[in-house]
Amino acid sequence: MLMTICLTLLSLLGSSTDGPVEYKLLATNKTSTMEKEMNQAAAEGFRFEGTMGGETAAGGNEIVMIMSRKPGDGGSRYNYKLLATKKTSTMQKELSEAGGAGFLYTGQTIYDSAFGGREVVVILERSDSAKTAYEYKLLATSRTSTMGKELNEAGRAGFVFCGMTVAETAFGGREVVSILRRQVGRE
């Protein structure tokens, strides 16, 4: 099933490009390994396209990433950081540190890790020429009406929506987790 979804994704991604595109599929059951493999692929010119966490036929619970590159494209190179935790306070702290270092949100998923249980995984990207810093705000609540109110408050403060998951966090149980960001500086 997952392979069918990935192949469908690849065909959709491939249909909107100008010229040939090369894809790299990465799959592992450790987020630390995934970050290392993503950065190795990035050094070869690949860029993050999408992710999903779940049970695969061959590997059990895995996080699966799709990366792509256009052959011969000498464009920007990227660095990647994966954040994975069940604690919203830890995620907020790690997002803040990464944002200050110029990392930009590119995706998130839920992943059942062997060691951490059900975690929110956030993928961040920084180009080799990044000169912008970001501030991130993580909102987590079990009530969708509260989330709507908090999103509007953050929007009035200049935060833009990045992504959302429904997750089981360490303190709040099942929560809607939203991530927002705003630009805070340029060199």
Residue ranges: model-predicted function:
Residues 1-5:
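Bacterial N-terminal signal peptides that target proteins for export
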Residues 6, 12-187:
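Terminus-proximal functional modules
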